[in-house]
Design a protein with these regions (language model features):
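Gly/Gly-Pro-rich "capping" loops immediately C-terminal to redox-active cysteine motifs
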Residues: 35, 39, 52-95, 101-103, ...
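Short pre-active-site segment immediately N-terminal to redox-active cysteine/selenocysteine motifs
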Residues: 34, 43-49, 54, 125
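Bacterial N-terminal signal peptides that target proteins for export
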Residues: 1-8
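Generic structural signal for secondary-structure transition and capping sites
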Residues: 47, 94-98, 138
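Processing junctions and N-termini across compartments
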Residues: 13, 41-44, 108
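C-terminal capping alpha-helices of c-type cytochrome domains
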Residues: 88, 109-147
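C-terminal motif of bacterial Sec signal peptides marking the signal peptidase cleavage site
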Residues: 15-18
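Electrostatic cytochrome c docking/interface patches
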Residues: 20-43, 57, 78-79, 147
Length: 147
């Protein structure tokens, strides 16, 4: 019986180790995208109306959109933005609103103020856009706690 328990623990550890990482998406995995085409899609879809991307020359929204609070994407993060989280934030932006921004600025009628692109964005644009955004995040491990 101990032998079976040990093997069960070993198998569980192997399965757990295989699940994770920045490309995990809880079962969601699209083909690899193209970063440059993703950047082009970001501009074509006018994502820069409300967003800017850390580490790029993409300009912040113009003055005509001054009422919009700019949501910065990319940059240093202490939690890994998974592939699934990026896809979800594009196709269902109300699922998780950007932290640190006043709700009245980023919502309309309790939903995300972000436009719904599900009827206009192609799957190729989605795949490439996610590749572009994921390339702009840099994971910075938190400082170890000292006791």
């Amino acid at each position: 019986m101990r032998f079976i328990t040990k093997w069960a623990v070993v198998l569980l550890m192997l399965f757990t180790a295989a699940c994770g990482g920045p490309k995990s998406g809880a079962g969601l995995r699209l083909p690899d995208g193209d970063v440059e085409r993703g950047k082009a899609a970001f501009l074509e879809l006018k994502c820069n109306t409300c967003h800017t991307v850390s580490g790029t020359e993409i300009a912040a929204p113009s003055k005509e959109y001054a009422y919009v609070r700019v949501v910065v994407l990319g940059g240093e993060v202490r939690q890994v933005k998974t592939y699934g989280a990026l896809v979800t934030s594009i196709i269902n932006p109300s699922h998780s609103l950007a932290p640190g921004y006043p709700k009245e600025v980023i919502t309309k009628d309790s939903q995300s103020a972000m436009a719904n692109f599900n009827d206009t964005m192609t799957v190729r644009q989605l795949i490439d856009l996610v590749a572009f955004l994921q390339s702009r995040y840099e994971f910075v491990p938190p400082e170890p706690a000292t006791y």
